[in-house]
Amino acid sequence: MTEFVAPSKIGRSFSGEFPVRLGDADSTGVVRLDGVARFLQDVATDDWDDTGIEASDTWVVRRTAIRVAPGGRWPRYKECLTLTTWCAGYGAAWAERRTDISVGGSLLLEAAALWVPVDRSGHPIRLRALFFEVYGESVAGRKVPGRVPAPVVVEGASRRPWPLRRADLDIVGHVNNAAVWQAVTEVVTGGVDQVVVVHHGPVESGHDVTLASAPGALWLLVDAEVRVSAAFTSTGAATS
């Protein structure tokens, strides 16, 4: 179970403004899950750039959990979102980033993401001393596990092809995290309260991807191996 820790009262935090545009909302005007995923990775990138740390490392996301905050709802088209992000935990070669999403001072969504630094060849590397110089105070010594449970596709799950597009690829040649969330958007119907997406392996150009789904879950498979899994609760979260 994902823990959504409260904002740190000390150390670094970073905020950015992100309006919900046409390309972020569904036909009812509610922000899509992949739109939220883009906002999360954009504010994370902006925060990292703002630190002034000069490094050739790239951060890739391993797990992302998004939930409707108590009393919150899903944002709508043209609303201006304030994303406030901070580092909430760490391990040997990963860090947890918490992000709150608000509109007009009201907290709507909470997110917790596990990020892994990789070198130019895509191999994970240990957190550098510079990381702790910038984020160590807000982390406050909180350690988080980096392992994720082995995925199992349930018996009877429906299956269909999930064609890849060149527009889905990111700078390291993998299908971008936000593009993966489009698969979740395709499967989820109605309001959801919480979604957790886990990346178990890369999905790359040229892969033949199968989308398997069952109530409350989906999997992206390459050669029968699960590369991405997701679990969600659909209980009619508020959208207005």
Give residue spans per PLM region.
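Hot-dog-fold acyl-thioester-processing enzymes
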Residues: T2-A65, P117-D193, S240
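HotDog/MaoC-like acyl-thioester-processing domains
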Residues: G11, A65-V154, P202-D208, A214-S240
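C-terminal accessory segment of soluble enzyme catalytic cores
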Residues: V195-P202
